[in-house]
Amino acid sequence: VEIYLPAHYDAEREEPYKVLYLSHGGGGEEGDWFHQGNAANIVDRLVTEGKCEEFIIVCMNNAEYIIEGMRDWDFDAIFENTKDYLIPYIEQNYNVSTEVADRAYAGLSNGAKTTTMIYYKDPELFGYYGMFSGSAAWAWPELEDYSAMKEPNIYLAAGFADHLMM
């Protein structure tokens, strides 16, 4: 796990921080959003310019959960780890809000696929979901029942020539 704390992080601040859980894509690791994506620099600049408030980013290594004999991630294990261990750990060790409305999950490529599965399994675990250049999650039979997907706060994005979205 790699964690971004705002420049002026205050463990005793009265108002707890919001949290963005951010998943890398296939072949990546927890540091990709910071080392390749410059997430910390981007957020620092947005905060400095008054375009967003300070928040915490938590990046996990989802590539550790690969189904044996397959190239795909074990999305059930990632979901359980996030829900049962990662969120409670962050909430116990950092000054963060425990309100669902103050928690978001987003991911790139295979991370977007992860985001889709987490949303499907427990749409109320996070207040917001972001899927960036995600692959064909609709190919999963379990996603044919959309009844759990009510009033979503979802942001979808893909590049103009992103073949995964065509």
Give the ranges of each region predicted by the language model.
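Non-catalytic cap/lid and distal C-terminal segments of serine-dependent acyl enzymes
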Residues: 1-166
